[in-house]
């Protein structure tokens, strides 16, 4: 599933397609609406944004984190904790923060912080169950995100 989604996103010339696909499937595996958010984001005209810190943190200008999450994580890893504002689909940061053991504020808020250390992975059990049992994804949603 992840590989097929990554191939479709790559065909649509989306940078970081593998990471986007991984995060979408990760979210679905944990019971979140990753693919629904990805479908919404794919309809957006703007899919990238140069990340620049200002006195308040980083203004994401409502560009979807489905596309920005990998770059945000690189920026925070290099420069430390950041306050994000005008966040859209912030839940897409969750898989990356868990993988990197990085703290995250409430990713459904329009503004929150990312950075610091996480000491526990609360999603390991859900991911193991999804790996063992597979995922049940709505056919229409799957078609929408795989661009078929």
Task: Label the predicted regions.
Residues 1, 13, 64-66, 134, ...:
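General structural signal for secondary-structure boundaries
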Residues 2, 6, 10, 16-54:
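N-terminal low-complexity or amphipathic/hydrophobic leaders
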Residues 35-113:
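A glycine-rich, acidic short-motif signal
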Residues 84-85, 96-148:
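Glycine-rich, aromatic-bearing surface loops/beta-hairpins
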Residues 10, 37, 41-44, 58, ...:
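Acidic, glycine/proline-rich low-complexity segments that act as flexible tails and inter-domain linkers
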